[in-house]
């Protein structure tokens, strides 16, 4: 049993849990202005069960590609034996359904709409016949929805409407999510082609994809600087993603795996930028 739990948690990418829980918690706190039981319920859901489902479904149906991908098998993606696939799918359902029921019951119609979109995006990204991850450009839009929707749910679940400034911030976050998905796809161009999988990177090539990623990161940084001071500090923090990806501006399909160096930096940049945002918000609140 403990081994099964270990494999399930490994598949859920613990290093990336913060990418979904933090947006929900931050948006909830900014809009509701308080911490209550619903806040903690959402944090727990988007921290672990949500990621078990999102990455678990992906690992099951991407198995043939993952076994050909040298970077899979650690923090960047588990390669679970086929004997564990049914367990992983059951865990995805069992761990999420109770939370979803409560979030639907105690949420608003708007948060329920975003929650429905979020769940559908998680399933559609990897599930057979839908496979949005194999539909170029739709793959980036869907992946970004995985990370932006928790923030939208957090911002609307208490009945308070997001401000214009929050919508701008969410727009910047959505651009960041698209850029990040494209960056991740660059390193997998050859592995995906060998497995006959399509992605935005396999269609426009590694170089085109990395350059698009850089542009989207830059747009995200510019958009957030349109917010009142001191939002420009966050814009500067986002530029670290631009510099990280731009190092591989002239990458080729043959050398696409080199982009993994950028991806490894990206994983830790999330913590750095998250810390900058947190410290900035605390400072503003104290002022």
Curated annotation (Swiss-Prot):
Q: Which residues cross the membrane?
A: 15-35, 37-57, 97-117, 137-157, 166-186, 218-238, 265-285
Q: Name one Pfam family in it.
A: UbiA
NCBIfam families assigned: PRK13105.1
User: Can you name this protein?
Assistant: Lycopene elongase/hydratase
**UniProt-recorded Gene Ontology molecular function terms:** transferase activity, transferring alkyl or aryl (other than methyl) groups
Keyword Transmembrane listed: yes
The protein's topology relative to the membrane is:
Multi-pass membrane protein
Q: In which pathway does it act?
A: Carotenoid biosynthesis
Which residues form each disulfide bond in the chain? Answer: none
Indicate the secretion signal residues: none
The record's section on InterPro entries has:
Prenyltransferase_related (IPR050475), UbiA_prenyltransferase (IPR000537), UbiA_sf (IPR044878)
This entry's Enzyme Commission designation comes to 2.5.1.149
Phenotype on disruption? Disruption mutant accumulates lycopene and shows altered carotenoid biosynthesis.
């Amino acid at each position: 049993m403990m081994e099964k739990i270990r494999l399930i948690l490994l598949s859920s990418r613990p290093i990336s849990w913060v990418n979904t829980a933090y947006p929900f918690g931050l948006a909830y706190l900014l809009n509701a202005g308080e911490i209550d039981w619903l806040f903690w319920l959402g944090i727990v859901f988007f921290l672990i069960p949500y990621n078990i489902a999102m990455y678990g479904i992906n690992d099951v149906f991407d198995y043939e590609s993952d076994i050909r991908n040298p970077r899979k098998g650690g923090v960047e993606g588990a390669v679970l034996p086929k004997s564990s696939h049914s367990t992983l799918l059951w865990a995805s359902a069992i761990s999420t359904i109770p939370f979803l029921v409560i979030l639907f019951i105690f949420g608003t119609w708007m948060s329920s709409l975003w929650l429905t979109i979020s769940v559908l995006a998680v399933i559609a990204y990897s599930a057979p016949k839908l496979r949005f991850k194999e539909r170029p450009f739709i793959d980036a839009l869907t992946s970004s929805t995985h990370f932006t929707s928790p923030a939208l749910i957090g911002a609307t679940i208490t009945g308070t409407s997001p401000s214009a400034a929050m919508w701008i911030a969410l727009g910047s976050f959505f651009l960041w999510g698209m850029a990040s998905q494209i960056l991740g796809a660059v390193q997998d161009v050859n592995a995906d082609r060998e497995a006959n999988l399509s992605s935005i990177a396999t269609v426009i090539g590694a170089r085109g994809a990395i350059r698009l990623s850089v542009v989207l990161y830059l747009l995200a940084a510019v958009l957030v600087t349109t917010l009142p001071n001191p939002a420009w500090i966050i814009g500067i923090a986002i530029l670290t993603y631009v510099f990280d990806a731009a190092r591989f501006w002239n990458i080729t399909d043959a050398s696409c795996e080199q982009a993994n160096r950028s991806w490894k930096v990206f994983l830790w940049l999330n913590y750095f930028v998250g810390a900058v945002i947190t410290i900035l918000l605390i400072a503003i609140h104290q002022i």
